[in-house]
């Protein structure tokens, strides 16, 4: 899945990252002309959770639907918060402890709107994206509700 749209209302870049997620390359894919702020979120796999060692997370997705959901979220954020550019990517497959899972960049003329939109995007991605997460730890494997 790879999507890049530039319109009158804003620019959206959506990328699937099955093997690795390059946070900086995703940011570099945006044209930041006219923007005075970029707020970024990078989610990584924790090595420990609730006192147990986490080896990896395994993400599965409804890939035919994922790109559209992320694009729809970006469109809502552009309209709701008045930001100008959004780039998002989420890993699918096995993600070891310490590796990048999700990257979101929001660019805007002003910082307040960028912060609000970035927080809203990660919260809504966790609620709406058709992605499922299995945790593989020292105590075994378990599917987790939501992405949080």
Question: Residue spans of the language-model regions?
Answer:
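N-terminal, polar/charged subdomain of small-to-medium soluble alpha/beta proteins
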Residues: 1-100, 107-148
């Amino acid at each position: 899945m790879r999507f890049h749209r530039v319109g009158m209302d804003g620019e959206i870049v959506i990328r699937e990252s099955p093997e690795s997620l390059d946070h900086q390359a995703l940011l570099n894919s945006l044209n930041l002309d006219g923007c005075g702020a970029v707020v970024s979120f990078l989610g990584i796999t924790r090595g420990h959770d609730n006192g147990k060692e986490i080896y990896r997370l395994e993400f599965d997705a409804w890939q035919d639907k994922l790109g559209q959901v992320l694009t729809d979220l970006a469109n809502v954020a552009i309209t709701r918060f008045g930001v100008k550019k959004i780039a998002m990517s989420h890993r699918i497959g096995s993600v070891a402890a310490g590796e990048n899972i999700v990257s979101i960049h929001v660019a805007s003329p002003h910082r307040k709107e960028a912060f609000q939109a970035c927080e809203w995007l990660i919260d809504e991605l966790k609620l709406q994206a058709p992605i499922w997460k299995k945790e593989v730890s020292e105590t075994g494997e378990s599917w987790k509700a939501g992405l949080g």
